Amino acid sequence: MWGFDGSSTLQAEGSSSDCLLKPVALFPDCTRENGFLVMSEVLNPDGTPHPSNARATIAEDQGLWVGLEQEYFLQQDGRPLGWPEDNNSYPAPQGEYYCGAGYCNVGDVARQIVEEHLDICLAAGINHEGINAEVAKGQWEFQVFGKGAHKAADQIWVARYILLRLCEKYGVDVEWHCKPFLGDWNGSGMHCNFSTDFMRDTGGKEYFLKLMDKFEEYKDEHIAAYGPDNHLRLTGLHETQSIDKFSWGVADRGASIRVPHSFVKDDAYKGYLEDRRPNSQGDPYKIVSRVSKTVAEVEAEYK
């Protein structure tokens, strides 16, 4: 355990400022000689979870597999890389930027950053699954997959930190906000792909429909856990469902839950699902915790 000043991090009052750090995951840091990054939980002085410690709300489940897709913008002086410097001007409309190549689509320094970030994450043992330029100009994504209820969320937090630190030397900022620019521009999400042992091995249409009913029942609870300002992003446009609605659909990126073709193949209804509502600035621990609780409630009927 390591004590720290919680008042300086807005986690405690100055008159009673001590908080504790409990290490939970260790990552080699290739940017330092013999260096490591330590992911820690925050505890109260008595050893109980601090109110900000959403990691402690996740029930351990090695059968829960989670893949998170972290989207973000790279910015300089408040404008995404590649956008005109004039605040009243915009780049060409979306269409050429997704998985784009060439200076006119992705510029020069952005790819250096995302490739270097990938290398540092891999050296750290983070299960970094890939990178791509996203739909809006200056927007990028990386993906992290983990087996076990905590792993993907731990690794997303560390990967975020690595990206922020890396961008310092390029004079570039990371914009995590889910809708930094209004208008005909995609927002940034953190789609949550998930499966359990039961979902992968047994599944079934009856189980799936019960699961979707439960996700709809807890629609508001899920939205509350999926990140701030989501009303700006979940509008029913730009590959989203409206924030006040719930829907699912096979291969439907305008639905709340996208069902892959592989899930319904041969009417098996088993595999993984994608919740498209979590946003880019959401707390991955809160996201995984909420998904896990809803799924566990349904699967309890089958045990």
How would you describe each model-predicted region?
Residues W83-A92, S188-F198, F246-W248, A255-V264:
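Short beta-strand elements
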